[in-house]
Amino acid sequence: MTQVAKKILVTCALPYANGSIHLGHMLEHIQADVWVRYQRMRGHEVNFICADDAHGTPIMLKAQQLGITPEQMIGEMSQEHQTDFAGFNISYDNYHSTHSEENRQLSELIYSRLKENGFIKNRTISQLYDPEKGMFLPDRFVKGTCPKCKSPDQYGDNCEVCGATYSPTELIEPKSVVSGATPVMRDSEHFFFDLPSFSEMLQAWTRSGALQEQVANKMQEWFESGLQQWDISRDAPYFGFEIPNAPGKYFYVWLDAPIGYMGSFKNLCDKRGDSVSFDEYWKKDSTAELYHFIGKDIVYFHSLFWPAMLEGSNFRKPTNLFVHGYVTVNGAKMSKSRGTFIKASTWLNHFDADSLRYYYTAKLSSRIDDIDLNLEDFVQRVNADIVNKVVNLASRNAGFINKRFDGVLASELADPELYKTFTDAAEVIGEAWESREFGKAVREIMALADLANRYVDEQAPWVVAKQEGRDADLQAICSMGINLFRVLMTYLKPVLPKLTERAEAFLNTELTWDGIQQPLLGHKVNPFKALYNRIDMKQVEALVEASKEEVKATTAPVTGPLADDPIQETITFDDFAKVDLRVALIENAEFVEGSDKLLRLTLDLGGEKRNVFSGIRSAYPDPQALIGRHTIMVANLAPRKMRFGISEGMVMAAGPGGKDIFLLSPDAGAKPGHQVK
């Protein structure tokens, strides 16, 4: 069935221009690229764009640390990012920057329309201000104690321990991340986007059925909580676009970042002249399709602020958001210390791009699920699927065709019904690519690969080749195998661009979706060359080690206590919550006969007595001095039978050991039995 050609604009979230691309980023760009390549194979007009997100305080401060201008830093980072994406064969039509004249003009245009339409409000707010650096502090540049769970060293917008959200002014004992100074409160006039005015429109958009169910459900929670006005301004000093007629005020990075999609496309239109129309894709009544591939961490901005901004400034809204989950490696969060925080460029020094493209694709679906890159499974799957099932199908047949028949395929199919089974699968596989059910598409393709290899096994061309008078049979069998290989590679073309190029060179024909309906008969193929090499765990080990070495090279050496006693593996809040810490009064302290390390402590928990053995004797030669002190103990530690008796808990102490052990004590006012929270 012939499809009507569509005009489609596809974007990926804009990478922030203060760091390298890593394998977490690559999931999204690979997912989008596979989808885009499939759309192009089906004859649709696709414009695939991206840009660097190049504004904000973090970029300004990092440039200062490096002793260069922000413009120089983002320019160098853009080149690095584009090199990485090209290395993974991401087929962007344009890659730009939010720090561009196109983006400035569009940001000012959208702001002016929102203002004219009454959606921009002014009001004075109180903010934390760094008196040493002379700057207002964004949320992430303030740290202090969480006002909810009292965990120290938490950012100014949310607690990474208990998950609570709050404003920077709610932090206990806040400190500037920039200078370490205690911030002060200062008033400043800010500009707010009236998001609540768009609640009805956004709810209708949510109910349209276009969005993923998980996204729609999350949006409904936000609607029920009530939408708030959105602060779209920041005070100088700030690296970004100054707001028109508001000296010293700048657009918040999240205002001009999504407009960067438009800016990059405008840049592409200007390059191509009349062949692409900006208005055709962005005007209010546009019939072109607009899709944003994004991670689940930025759904809020793309599902609420962005469509509301577009609606309020008379531009079209996205057709849909395609949201994905995070990447874990070997079942855990990417870790620099374990060597699993892997940069895109590091990967390409050890593996080809097609291998990761295939592994991610095989695991992706249309749901917002996290993807685990299990490196051992990665090696096994790439070898089993790409090498053993697909490439091997070509290699085990091509030799006979090249040597015995001068590269010419048979003039008829040996098994037309089997070939029809392969071509009939185009509809199911195509629908899976279209609906982003990538894992399903791969499973369907590999099931066909199994059928193809079973055919070759049953026909045994290596046996036929030794039998006189069966040259025609040999040519027919091997030609059938090569034709089935051609169909498989056509289905895999969106995923494996480099392998596809080599396959097309061997087959001496371009692989097209509709082309498989006509098998290659009497066709001359080129001499077969190895299409793909097996991979092994030694490459994985080298990759992990290289990632560790990169971290060492870019990280200042740790000195002091952390050098001798590194921080342990991360635990979850649920794990931490199991530990019951209590204030205890030391009623008695005495030596333990037969031990030169232990003291026996009698602790009062406020109505309950505990006997605890503690290895602090070297630091407290006079145990009587501890009597009457308050300390902290682990109250729910299972009793431990020791040679000297049963220890019913553990007291908390710090220090490297020996004489340098320091028993922890609470502030004055804490009572025995109080829980430490």
Curated annotation (Swiss-Prot):
A motif ('HIGH' region) lies at residues 15-25. Signal peptide: none annotated. ATP binds at residue 336. Zn(2+) binds at residues 146, 149, 159, 162. Its main location: cytoplasm. It is found in: Cytoplasm. The keyword Manganese does not apply. Binds 1 zinc ion per subunit. Keywords: Aminoacyl-tRNA synthetase, ATP-binding, Cytoplasm, Ligase, Metal-binding, Nucleotide-binding, Protein biosynthesis, RNA-binding, tRNA-binding, Zinc. GO terms for cellular component: cytosol. GO terms for molecular function: ATP binding; metal ion binding; methionine-tRNA ligase activity; tRNA binding. CDD domains: Anticodon_Ia_Met (cd07957), MetRS_core (cd00814), tRNA_bind_EcMetRS_like (cd02800). Its cofactor is Zn(2+). GO terms for biological process: methionyl-tRNA aminoacylation. It catalyses: tRNA(Met) + L-methionine + ATP = L-methionyl-tRNA(Met) + AMP + diphosphate. Homodimer. NCBIfam families: metG, metG_C_term, PRK00133.1. Belongs to the class-I aminoacyl-tRNA synthetase family. MetG type 1 subfamily. HAMAP family: Met_tRNA_synth_type1. Is required not only for elongation of protein synthesis but also for the initiation of all mRNA translation through initiator tRNA(fMet) aminoacylation. This is Methionine--tRNA ligase. It comes from Shigella flexneri.
